Regions:
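Active-site-facing substrate-recognition patch
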Residues: 1-61, 202-210
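PRPP-dependent phosphoribosyltransferase catalytic core
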Residues: 3-9, 140-210
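Short, well-ordered alpha-helices that flank and scaffold nucleotide-derived cofactor binding pockets
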Residues: 51, 55, 77, 81-85, ...
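Short glycine-rich phosphate-binding loop at a beta-alpha junction
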Residues: 61-70
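Conserved acidic residues
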Residues: 63, 121, 151
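Short, glycine/charge-rich flexible loops or terminal/linker lids adjacent to PRPP-binding catalytic cores
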Residues: 77-124, 134
Length: 210
């Protein structure tokens, strides 16, 4: 399956939304939104995409698949499942990083006893959509702080030209790379033209509540 085929899978489930004013988690604005939540409704689609995500890696090369909440929970499960389908022995585990609920700077951490499965292990970090790579970078830093070896970062979509240098100098693999125009709020032409901010998708509601 080539990039066109994968993009068609995104389109078929309504995961590509255009013609509105979106605010990304990173705080940047755009007229295009990759609605990853639309993908998670379709288990067959997510399974097929995760199978593609782990193709570059040998099964025995990955001990644990890690994803940040919330989407990373689903991705880590399916990615580990498909790695285990190819393994001849042993097991690849799937765990997720949570975000602290206290304080303004909500950092990722491993709760529920998951931290014990990181040290000395080869880790594949999975993410749905990369814009700045900030969440993935935080997870990578936490994994390294616990003594894990990050083999790579694998994503469904790289929409922000995220490079290895942006995420701690690890390999970045993405099923599709989309070159989208994004803007800082102060430079956003949609804001200047008073295009209403979409409050149903993205972080528009939080942006307007500031």
């Amino acid at each position: 399956m080539n990039d066109t085929g994968i993009m068609q899978m995104f389109s078929d489930v309504g995961a590509i939304v255009t013609g509105s004013h979106f605010v990304y988690t990173s705080g940047r604005h755009s007229s295009v939104y990759i609605n990853k939540d639309a993908l998670y409704l379709h288990t067959g689609t997510i399974s097929a995409l995760c199978k593609r995500m782990i193709e570059p890696f040998k099964p025995e090369q990955i001990d644990v698949v890690v994803g940040p909440v919330l989407g990373g929970i689903v991705l880590s499960q399916w990615a580990a499942h498909h790695l285990n389908q190819r393994r001849t022995g042993g097991e690849t585990l799937a765990i997720y990083a949570e975000k602290a609920s206290d304080g303004r700077d909500k950092q990722f951490f491993f709760g529920r006893g998951y931290a014990q499965y990181i040290a000395g292990k080869n880790i594949l970090v999975v993410e749905d959509v990369l814009t700045t790579g900030g969440s993935a970078r935080q997870v990578i830093e936490v994994v390294r702080g616990l003594g894990g070896n990050v083999v790579a970062l694998s994503a469904l979509c790289n929409r922000g030209r995220v490079r290895p240098a942006d995420v701690g100098d690890v390999m970045v693999s993405a099923l599709v790379s989309i070159d989208l125009d994004t803007y800082a709020p102060e430079d956003c032409p949609l804001c200047r033209e008073h295009v209403p901010v979409n409050t149903e998708l993205g972080k528009g509601k939080s942006f307007l509540a500031r």
